[in-house]
Amino acid sequence: MKQLLQQLLVQSLEVLMDNNILESMPENIRVDHSKDKAQGDFASNIAMLLSEQAQCSSKVLAQKIKANFPDSVDVEKIEIVGPGFINFFMSQSSNALVVEDIIKQGGNYGLSNIGMGQRVLLEFVSANPTGPLHVGHGRGVAYGAAVAHLLRAVGFEVDCEYYVNDAGRQMDILAISVYLRYVETEQFPDNCYKGDYIFDIAKKISGVKKLDIFTNTCKDTSEWKVQKNSIDKERYIDDLIANCKLQLGSDYRKVFDFAINSILSDIKIDLADFGVEYHQWFSEQSLVDSGLSEEIVKKLQDLGYIYEKEGALWFRTTDFGDDLDRVVVRDNGIHTYFSYDIAYHLGKFERGYDRIINIWGADHHGYIARVKASIKALNYNPDKLEILLVQFVNLFRDGKKVSMSTRSGSFITLKELREEVGNDVVRFFYILRKSTQHMDFNLDLAKSKSNENPVFYIQYAYVRICSVLKQGMPFMADIDLLVLNNELETLLIKELNRYKDILQSSALNYEPHVLACYLRKLAGYFHSYYNNCEFLVDDDKLRNSRLLLITAVQQILANGLNLLGISTPNSM
């Protein structure tokens, strides 16, 4: 209906142009759903936007637009309100058409080709493989998966990618943590990884010892040259890593790989069990092995953007909008994570995607400027890269906040959360709020079977419709949707009419919470309808029309939940 109104407005404006009231047609004519039913079904502010061009007040221009608006059986009346808003009241017959369209199109209703097949690379989660995915990561998982589904629904081709941070110091700390548990040392550094999963990996190593995983294993670490009483904990862990590498020789890499692969395997299983699939798993180590990061630094040097200070190589990111210059090669010759990120993002651009989207935790906000600076320095358009931020999650149990830390091993894993409350609840709770807002995950509410639990509330609406339709299906030959004229039926039909716009808005603005809130509202309208109206009445036309209406509601609930990765149970 929005498209129809836009077309009719164009025809009205063309008449005004022919009469020299307007000089040009605007590029975009905005028509929105009215928030207040008393103000009609749709509204447009076009008169206020064009009043200066027309050299008259917006209210006068609105009246002229109305006077030249083409007759349409779909538009019952037009009102001018306020400074010049144009409100449209649609006819009952035009509103009711949505029910038939939904029934005809089924699972395809709402899908579009706005994206026109543009290729999108969507990177999300990319958590360090230093431990299992926890509840903090889960929000990025659910959000990224929902964004991917929504973009595909409006015609984009989306590839999902996970960037595996399998190189660098944190991976060395993981390896030394596993090895120290393997050799059962009594003194375990505070800044090693302490979770039970470290013990589990160490036990796995013991289990494969028969396969000769080690040739240089020595469980005596007393001779290692480390400053055990050093106040500098970071220096202490670096000494441990250096001694472990020296002691194990080539076997160190076996520990390193075994630890990372064990965790990465669990992450992949966890994501698959959560219903999330990736097209690519991109290894940071591949950038090290290929020498690509060195090539990038050399290229930046040739462009004059690298300078040396205190033995390190610095990238002049301030020339491209960053607030500070950044180190790309430390004074010890080791490349920084940033240098690998530059190489990784350059590779993304070279793969030919139309859009590149990163979903990062909100704590990476300060990283955006330097990454975009590197893209600009390498002569690519930084606006092609969109970075979406996901805020932190606080988990509450019995009204108390659950403290979590990956390094200390004190955290609730995503798997544990899913097993406690179920995939559907976890997904929906994660995306119910705008991703840039902090989120409190209430475990008690998540486990409740009440109307306050939004997942239960929506799925229960779907189940109720299933129950009604088991007692009688609509007979299509005996339907007259114009008999659906009570207030609750009108509300439901108008809400169904909003679905296409909600879907497009959710997709193009990367806001799955908009669709989630819509589904909760639609479910609420249905529950009111269910509690106040009978469906299996004696009047054939009324019975069949009501059954058709709730069938359409059921279809939209299914379509929306499917896009969010939520199931539609037939019974509860």
Swiss-Prot record:
Keyword Ligase: yes
Catalytic activity of the protein: tRNA(Arg) + L-arginine + ATP = L-arginyl-tRNA(Arg) + AMP + diphosphate
EC number(s) recorded for this UniProt protein: 6.1.1.19
Entries under InterPro entries matching the protein: aa-tRNA-synth_I_CS, Arg-tRNA-ligase, Arg-tRNA-synth_N, Arg-tRNA-synth_N_sf, ArgRS_core, DALR_anticod-bd, Rossmann-like_a/b/a_fold, tRNAsynth_Ia_anticodon-bd
Record keywords: Aminoacyl-tRNA synthetase, ATP-binding, Cytoplasm, Ligase, Nucleotide-binding, Protein biosynthesis
GO molecular function, one term: arginine-tRNA ligase activity
Gene Ontology terms describing biological process: arginyl-tRNA aminoacylation
Family of this protein: Belongs to the class-I aminoacyl-tRNA synthetase family.
Quaternary context: Monomer.
NCBIfam families, A to Z: argS
Protein name: Arginine--tRNA ligase
Protein species of origin: Vesicomyosocius okutanii subsp. Calyptogena okutanii (strain HA)
UniProt lineage: Bacteria, Pseudomonadati, Pseudomonadota, Gammaproteobacteria, Candidatus Pseudothioglobaceae
Gene for this chain: argS
